[in-house]
């Protein structure tokens, strides 16, 4: 039985199939994303969506879709699908779908009378290019395929309407055409491996709707330009390959390119393989370095997200080299930012006060998953520089107080991951002593002391670090641990924030925590009772009057709700670490059971990946960006930890059996 396979009954039921999406990317930030039935449901959906650095740092939809029609005996059967109003779809091509399988490459099987046609899509790894392979498996009469391209040429976060500014010119190229609708955009080359007949038939297709945008309370209607169509005859057993790219290609090489790309694919035949594929889709390489995208389809590179997702998206899938290259790029960018105050060209939010703390944590994961000696050799100097820069006040909006704690000002501008704001002002004004900042700070100082512990020349400095850690730890307990047994989320002077939030799971789950085992267990119990869901930890306890579990409504309503209840899978990574620290090997079966909730998502939302957030209440519907790096990365980390713990348990049981 296939791991990711959907049958006719599901595919023709649009209530079930339309919410399911698929994503494929390359290493330049380009992507292909749509619903599994091929009907675009977001403005960010498209067959070929690419970054255009000369214009901005966002993606742009060139080719929105390609509608295929099967022609026999003069009758045309259109396989496309677009929405034009509430429950109004045309041309209803989904009714011909018999199966969708995306274990290796997304594959649709259509049946039109006696015709069986398969459609396989491959997004090229290192080029802004997609190949679609059509194979006529069965036919009893002469058959022709017609292809009608729907063009957008717009920012992926905007919409286009009929206008007279478009360039209607068509340039004929080998087995296809090239066109460019607006100045500043690259030409779109659409070619086939066989000779194709092009027919000029220019039309605006007006009033196409994207229902997921409508639900989000944002503009959702647009007009798309269709300049004409291609026609090619096809015989039983024959294959036609379509290529869409920003450069002219040799049609004779299409089959070879397709086959070579297929060899590089890891089949999505398991939970782990799905997440491994999802992780690699976040890799981004450009002239400035190598990065991890925060998520698709609308996020770019964001500092905190990159660091939280990095260990899982590289080390947990044995991509150590990518870890080093990405980390080296980040360290270089952060050094430049701290030295000059200039924002980075690629990494957004690199100047937030907790970035150095998360960077140290990301380095620490290399020691955890790979090797302490190599970690020491590669990164000890960087960790030392970061700790000393913090101690000397070199990080903007991060002040070290005499009590050893770090202070940040967040009343006017959000400084933490709970960053929702209205009118530029934070909804949750976390300011003063912020819980995870200081937990990460204690962890960082202890980690540096550990890295330098074997160095005789650093013995005095290590003693100084350990003394500082003692001061931080004592102040942390006095400041954050309350009489109820959990941790204040932030403390600002005499004000203590009593809301039960998941940042305390971070404090418990870190390798070095100022909390003793009894304190950790009490805090963990609060997380389990009030925050834990099958899709991660809630951002706020349901007992709070501010609790808003469902992330729906217009942009303002969603902004108010985003950090007031919806659950995040990435926080489960810290929760599982905390659980193992409290319960050891006896906690293994519980964490394994909890992972089932994430595996269930492999056939929901964005197939094979994890959404940005999930409703805090059942049925825990996925919301936000369809695929996010820190969620995928942290669940991969948990899987790796579970595998390590399983080996320890097996070894322990084996040793006991020989006694």
Predicted regions and their residues:
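Alpha-solenoid helical-repeat scaffolds
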Residues: 268-287, 299-300, 316
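Aromatic-rich carbohydrate-recognition surfaces in CAZymes
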Residues: 138-139, 160-163, 234-236, 300, ...
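Catalytic cores of carbohydrate-active enzymes
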Residues: 273, 391, 398-401, 442-551, ...
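Extended, well-ordered alpha-helical scaffold segments
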Residues: 146, 256-267, 271-275, 318-332, ...
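Terminal accessory carbohydrate-recognition/targeting modules of carbohydrate-active enzymes
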Residues: 1-267, 297, 319, 331, ...
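Carbohydrate-binding/catalytic loop surfaces
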Residues: 282-299, 340-362, 366, 400-430, ...
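Glycine-rich, acidic and aromatic/proline-enriched surface loops and short helix-turn segments
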Residues: 277-285, 328-336, 600-607
